[in-house]
Amino acid sequence: MEIKRLPALSDNYIFLLYDADTQTAAVVDPAEPTPVLECLNKLGAQLVAIFNTHHHYDHVGANNQLQQYFPNLCIYGGSEDRGRIPGQQVFLKEGDRVEFGQRVGEVLFVPGHTRAHIAYYFPPKLSQETGELFCGDTLFGGGCGRLFEGTPTQMVNSLTKLRNLPDNTRVWCAHEYTLKNLQFALTVDPDNLVLKNRYHQVKEFRHQGQATVPSILGEEKLTNPFLRWDNSAIQLTIGMTDPARVFGKLRGMKDTF
């Protein structure tokens, strides 16, 4: 399974999964149709599936148009997003499986950013492969999504699920927010040398116009404050130890950063 990263809108990424053996493709969170159609045309591929993580327009905006071009494709989304995702045909819940090419993905229910948010985790099939996590707006490079419909407790539980995945998992988040997220992270975890090194690396990447997605989950665990609510240095900075309270305080600080 090849993964193509397609920039869209101002800072979104659409991810196109391509199976060369069958010349079929699936897309995750198509914000707009043109990048998808152009990539499909270059590959000579047929679109067979859309995997939506949640209902926000910048993740489902191309559903209807792509369905018009490929009327036999199947549109997947969370069961609690019924009526909110255009064209949705399959309603997924925690523990369900989705198949594409030779890979089988696991559905994770990760409410917080929205009440119905899901993520797709494709574990490695072969020893040389990595796991692939498509997490929408739940986890970002160096950050996480705002709480539009969920609570801090829900988000901590959701991020715990993601944090428990293998360290070498690639994190395909839906926005290019990493640099600003790391700038904030340094304000709450200023003595973290791994974080400082990552910040300088990401700053150089962005200066050169390079993407910072995907990131590696192991690096997120060491540098992303929203996966480090139980870190003693961050707890000391925040002045709290309860996970949901630490997370809620961090999220509130980031919202006004």
UniProtKB/Swiss-Prot annotation:
Catalytic activity: an S-(2-hydroxyacyl)glutathione + H2O = a 2-hydroxy carboxylate + glutathione + H(+)
GO molecular function, one term: hydroxyacylglutathione hydrolase activity
Domain of life: Bacteria
Residues where Zn(2+) 2 binds: 58-59, 137, 175
Keywords assigned by UniProt, alphabetized: Hydrolase, Metal-binding, Zinc
Intrachain S-S bonds: none
EC class (word): hydrolase
EC number: 3.1.2.6
Binding site for Zn(2+) 1: 54, 56, 113, 137
Cofactor entry: Zn(2+)
GO biological processes: methylglyoxal catabolic process to D-lactate via S-lactoyl-glutathione
Pathway named in the protein's UniProt entry: Secondary metabolite metabolism; methylglyoxal degradation; (R)-lactate from methylglyoxal: step 2/2
Cofactor note: Binds 2 Zn(2+) ions per subunit.
HAMAP family: Glyoxalase_2
Similarity section: Belongs to the metallo-beta-lactamase superfamily. Glyoxalase II family.
Biological role stated in the UniProt entry: Thiolesterase that catalyzes the hydrolysis of S-D-lactoyl-glutathione to form glutathione and D-lactic acid.
Name of the molecule in the record: Hydroxyacylglutathione hydrolase
Organism whose genome encodes this protein: Rippkaea orientalis (strain PCC 8801 / RF-1) (Cyanothece sp. (strain PCC 8801))
Organism placement in taxonomy: Bacteria, Bacillati, Cyanobacteriota, Cyanophyceae, Oscillatoriophycideae
Name of the coding gene: gloB
